[in-house]
Amino acid sequence: MKHGMWKPWTLGIGAVAVVALLGVRAARVAAGGGQAGGGTASRLLAGSIDFHVHGLPDMEPRSVDSADLARTAKDRGMRALVLKNHFDPTASLAYTVRKQVPGIEVFGGIVLNRTVGGINARAVEHMTQVTGGWGRVVWFPTRDSEYQVAAEVKDNPASKRPSVSVSKNGALLPEVKDVIAVIAKHQLVLETGHSSPQDSLLLLAEGKKQGVQHMMVTHGAFEMSLAQMQEAVKLGGFIEFVYRIIPMKDGANAKFTPAALAQLLRTIGVEWCVLSSDLGNPAYAMPTEGFGEFLSKMLAAGMTERELAQMTKDNPARLLGLPAS
């Protein structure tokens, strides 16, 4: 797996330092969550949607409780959050957070890893029936995907474990098509998860065939070539780009400079790109702060505020079926 972006959560600093760091961050959340570049970041965050963010509760360490995350995002003027958990559906969590923090739209979804039965159409159908109907996103396997597990085993043979496949011999499995039928029926968002580039394109092609209206390649640039991303767009898929794809002050691994990423976004077409944070790991910035930092860096790299609004407001709203802001 290139760039190390999908490996299980590991701490980049010592345990004692993490405890201290979380204490400082908890205080910052209580005070409003930091400034992330001050006025520029605040202006860019206003009305935005973070389509990919992790909060507590979770089986993995996270930097912030989901309700506190929503409060901070609301205070910064953000419109909505999509809560992601690799192992537990978040439709119920979205309902609860909405009750706790009125004034910001919160959505959830389901990731088709082994904890929900893998490729499980019934689990997806059930998610749509949770109170509120805020479960809107279906991610194909992430941590348990055949592609990710194979990469982990290549790096460390002792990590061998069961995985979840979406295809065999270049064709999608029947149960995958069943899941896509449920996505189409309820007009959910199809996300490719941690699938291989080839499998991601198969998922998008089947989604298009079955009439799915909302599709996105999960942090696509980590694994896909430009040609593959362009093919995904032809199939109707948005391409997601997240915080750690460019260098950040916390030392996160990066694939592009901000200027190179700006060029890539324009080559693909900003009307088909979504910028998200994918934050919540305590080793990195607090989610809202990091999202603001990401957008500020892209503005400094020459992107216009209108282009950034397209990728953080208009396109995410379209995916979620929300009216334009």
What does each of the following model-derived ranges do?
Residues 270-287:
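Short acidic/histidine-rich active-site segments
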Residues 48-50, 80, 105-107, 135-139, ...:
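Structural preference for beta-strand elements that scaffold enzyme active sites
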Residues 117-197, 203-216:
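Extended substrate/RNA-proximal surfaces in nucleic-acid metabolism proteins
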Residues 29-104:
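An N-terminally biased module of ancient metal coordination in phosphate/nucleic-acid-related enzymes
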Residues 42-44, 74, 94-103, 126-133, ...:
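Acidic (Asp/Glu)-rich catalytic clusters
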Residues 288-325:
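Mid-to-C-terminal alpha-helical segments outside catalytic/metal-binding sites
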Residues 54-56, 86, 109-115, 141-145, ...:
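Active-site beta-loop-alpha junctions enriched in small/polar residues
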Residues 181, 188-193, 197-256, 274:
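Catalytic pocket-lining loop regions of alpha/beta-barrel enzymes
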